[in-house]
Regions:
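Cleavable N-terminal signal peptides
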Residues: 9-10, 20
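Surface-exposed, polar/charged interaction patches used for macromolecular assembly or partner binding
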Residues: 2, 20-294
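Bacterial N-terminal signal peptides that target proteins for export
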Residues: 1-8
């Protein structure tokens, strides 16, 4: 075969392969939350939690400052407050965002108004109840347990029965339980499949554990999507007499269909907030993206 013919054959084959790939996009893959996802997700409480029980110190005479699974810790209360050994507790820590900048306009005020964000840092079991303290073993840890972390009675969380009903990128609005992603776990604002997120809707709006929500994005207002912020006021550029880009009018933006970019399953619900798990994403998800019940 002549070199030119061989090259043309390869070119045709590459084109055919590319066309086949374009016509058969990879279907979305859904992820199921694990035990760790469910019990380490955190939540936003309407009011600060009041608990006189907290971690005082740990083994090694207090020389150890952080604790994890398998370690022994000492709690602030004993007989009279903790009845019997064997009780299990969830260890929590109130959390604030160390970054002062907002990811979208009004994010900081929204977080403040919704309540206090708590990290779930571990699960412990009381082994010995002393007169004024208690000794406990760290069963599971989601991070570093530290002195001062509070402990509340452990409650089993229902595992969401997640069932995918298929994915429609341009699904029409359901009009149900509309809200938005306020922020992600550890205050992440750029998110993807497997990340935990906090929503600004909760039990008062009918949100329940196990519900599936669509994540979607519209062309308006657009300022909640950093990748589109550049397009909110630019002037079309020209190369000679050829226009290189196009500025959409607000009317045109409103006429365009919204883009469904992922799905969430609800892990936990408080009065005005909910914790969700991103089961699927077709692109990067951002704080400020909107959600609705499927």
């Amino acid at each position: 075969m002549k070199p030119t013919s061989a090259f043309l054959s390869l070119l045709v084959l590459a084109f055919a392969s590319g066309s086949a790939f374009a016509q058969n996009p990879v279907p979305p893959v859904w992820h199921q939350p694990t035990y760790s996802d469910i019990y380490c997700a955190g939540f936003i409480a309407d009011k600060p939690l009041e608990s006189g029980l907290f971690v005082v110190t740990g083994e090694e005479g207090g020389l150890k400052a952080i604790y994890s699974a398998g370690d022994t810790i000492f709690l602030s209360r004993g007989a009279g407050n903790i009845v019997n050994p064997g009780g299990e507790y969830m260890v929590l820590r109130a959390s604030t965002d160390p970054v002062p900048q907002e990811f979208f306009k009004g994010q900081k005020e929204m977080l403040r108004s919704l309540g206090t964000l708590y990290k779930e840092v571990g699960r412990i079991r009381v082994n010995i109840v002393h007169e004024k303290t208690a000794t406990a073993n760290v069963m599971n840890s989601c991070g570093e347990i530290q002195a001062g972390d509070i402990a509340i009675p452990f409650n089993q969380k229902p595992a969401p029965k997640f069932l995918s009903a298929g994915f429609d990128r341009f699904a029409p609005p359901s009009g149900k339980n509309e809200g938005l992603i306020v922020t992600g776990r550890e205050f992440l604002n750029t998110l993807g499949t497997g990340d935990k997120v906090y929503l600004n809707i909760g039990a008062s709006k009918g949100v329940e554990v196990g519900q599936s929500y669509r994540i979607y994005r519209t062309f308006l207002p657009g300022v909640k999507d950093p990748s589109r912020m550049y397009a909110t006021g630019y002037v079309p550029e020209y190369a000679g007499k050829e226009r290189m880009n196009y500025k959409l009018t607000d009317y045109q933006k409103r006429a365009l269909p919204r883009d469904v970019i992922g799905e969430i399953v609800i892990l936990w619900v408080e009065g005005r907030t909910a914790t969700g798990y991103i089961t699927m994403a077709t692109t990067e998800i951002y704080s400020g993206d909107q959600v609705e019940l499927k």
